[in-house]
Amino acid sequence: MGSTHEHVDLLVYINGEPLDLNQSRYAMKSSYGHIHGGEGDIMHLHAINIPLSWFMETLDLAITPTSINVHGFEYVTNDDNVLMVVINGNAIGDMDQMLIDEDKILIYYGPGDEDDLNRAHSLIPDRAQEINSMPNKGD
């Protein structure tokens, strides 16, 4: 596996609230790709060709095109709520999409109405580019 040092902005938004990825349960799960403690909005990638599904599984947040499992509770697309994964403004259906430096990822579960989606989009962090410009890329 080749090495790299890249960063991706991440927001997991469930039922109107961002999931708090700053908790220690999410920090440093793998040396290939991880979240640093206290920086739950940034994915740190140290290997190439990391799929979104693999990264989410390392956080115990297994994801499919229609569901996300958050610590044993499965949020499934139904008549009232929808799971959407949006990368750089485009909805995707392939959870094995490879992560790319400075991607902006929204994992959304909720009613899917315009107001809620707009709120979620407004909360997507914008830090990956800033971290990439730091000495040692923030590590």
Where do the PLM segments sit?
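Ubiquitin-like/PB1-type beta-grasp interaction modules and other compact soluble beta-rich domains
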Residues: 1-139
